[in-house]
Amino acid sequence: MTLAEFWPLCLRRLHDMLPQGQFAQWIAPLTVGEEGGVWVVYGKNQFACNMLKSQFAGKIEAVREELAAGRSAFVFKPGEGVRYEMAAVEGAVEPAEPSLHAGSEEMPVQEVLLDELPSEEPVKPAASKTAADILAERMKNLPHEPRHTAEPASRPESEVLAKARTDAQRDAEEARYEQTNLSPDYTFDTLVEGKGNRLAAAAAQAIAESPGQSYNPFFLYGSTGLGKTHLVQAVGNELLKNRPDAKVRYMHSDDYIRSFMKAVRNNTYDVFKQQYKQYDLLIIDDIQFIKGKDRTMEEFFYLYNHFHNEKKQLILTCDVLPAKIEGMDDRLKSRFSWGLTLELEPPELEMRIAILQKKAEAAGISIEDEAALFIANLIRSNVRELEGAFNRVGASSRFMNRPVIDIDLARTALQDIIAEKHKVITADIIIDAVAKYYRIKISDVLGKKRTRNIARPRQVAMSLTKELTTLSLPSIGDSFGGRDHTTVMHGIRAVAKLREEDPELAQDYEKLLILIQN
């Protein structure tokens, strides 16, 4: 199937599955093309590409897999290509006269990543119009509602007004993204709270209300995919909602490094310093990547001191505690701990279920409790994987015209993940992981010692073996030094009770589940 045959059909599918406003605003105007054999969806700018990839790529790919499975995945990049009209009915492929735009010379395909920044240029000064300025300017020029009946027009005046307001809001949103690099999707309203992030969320909201005061810097650490980026960007979006004139910037540490090296190379160091010092809130993701770069660390040390002395807010994320960042300047390690340092924990079962329910609500899909529980038990490691699993199930729900996600649909959509989770886990793997986690010997786990520091990890390992393998109780007993099945049963029951009563053991158990499954 050619792109000219596929895209009109894809438009028809997307039109049928998306709300009318979303389709008209984001999908209908798209142009597409082919570069080096790769199908490309063009957005008018970086903001549009990021929005398309985060919100609609899954749906587009689901259609491609159904109708053109032999083709590689689409890439998303800024530019202009050919616009096709939507197929009138399924199978009717009537592309409109191609609208070839200037600059048809083939460009190398560059895939747009979700966390990619708009450009590698130094951070732009905030002297340009703010999002609020643009919105106010556009709204001021809108036509007023007529007091009397106007002459017949091709569209009602109210529709013109509504479209103009929508365009103004979208332009203002794009302007905000260009200035701040904040995603409009990452807000406190869209954040699901649970035990793993509740304290961090409360601190983040306090910072948004009074930046630069008590919690400065705010250092957030944890494994990949736990929601650090969502939480820190929510601070920026909330601050701008309360103070539209605030100067905010979110960036990845790689982009800070690139902009600094470019300033050194171009002898624009003074401009670089002023660009960063202007912000009221600076958010840097994955700060650990500046380690080992002496000049960059030295410059960031001075920038840090400026923010602290001027009571401007600095928010940093990392994968480990500040003290554990090997190769980081000791002065920076010390300063990273001056404010508030918090860890994001993997989401517990209740939080994972709540995330799935919120995703379903946002997508206009109903999910049965049994299906949500199944998916939440299958994906334990992080929020990103959980959302990815839901997107797959949601796509299956739409294409199969099943408005309710039940457990059978979830199993069918995620069957490859189910197979992957269970195909390599053995009792030996679990015993080894538990021994390393509790820093005891494997021989102790299998032996006869009954001291608490040995017996409890042994019971945890038995319980994990029961949950993650298909072994019977007698077989589990054999794997643990030839123990009787009643001993295994007693250990499993003891761990189940302790998980309800002892938060520390419950947390250890969840961490081991994630460690073993990944």
UniProtKB/Swiss-Prot annotation:
Domain II as annotated region, ranges: 72-180
Single biological process term from Gene Ontology: regulation of DNA replication
Keywords for the protein's UniProt record, in alphabetical order: ATP-binding, Cytoplasm, DNA replication, DNA-binding, Lipid-binding, Nucleotide-binding
GO molecular function annotations of the record: ATP binding; ATP hydrolysis activity; DNA replication origin binding; lipid binding
Top-level taxon of origin: Bacteria
PANTHER family named in the record: CHROMOSOMAL REPLICATION INITIATOR PROTEIN DNAA (PTHR30050:SF2)
Organism for this UniProt entry: Neisseria meningitidis serogroup C / serotype 2a (strain ATCC 700532 / DSM 15464 / FAM18)
Protein family membership: Belongs to the DnaA family.
Chief location bin: cytoplasm
Region annotation Domain IV, binds dsDNA: where it falls in the sequence: 398-518
Residues bound to ATP: 225, 227-229
Compartment(s) where it occurs, according to its Swiss-Prot or TrEMBL record: Cytoplasm
Biological function: Plays an essential role in the initiation and regulation of chromosomal replication. ATP-DnaA binds to the origin of replication (oriC) to initiate formation of the DNA replication initiation complex once per cell cycle. Binds the DnaA box (a 9 base pair repeat at the origin) and separates the double-stranded (ds)DNA. Forms a right-handed helical filament on oriC DNA; dsDNA binds to the exterior of the filament while single-stranded (ss)DNA is stabiized in the filament's interior.
Signal peptide residue numbers: none
Protein name: Chromosomal replication initiator protein DnaA
Positions of region (Domain III, AAA+ region): 181-397
Chain residue ranges for the region called Domain I, interacts with DnaA modulators: 1-72
InterPro entries per UniProt: AAA+_ATPase, Chromosome_initiator_DnaA, Chromosome_initiator_DnaA-like, Chromosome_initiator_DnaA_CS, DnaA_C, DnaA_dom, DnaA_N_dom, DnaA_N_sf
Subunit note: Oligomerizes as a right-handed, spiral filament on DNA at oriC.
GO cellular component, one term: cytoplasm
Domain remark text: Domain I is involved in oligomerization and binding regulators, domain II is flexibile and of varying length in different bacteria, domain III forms the AAA+ region, while domain IV binds dsDNA.
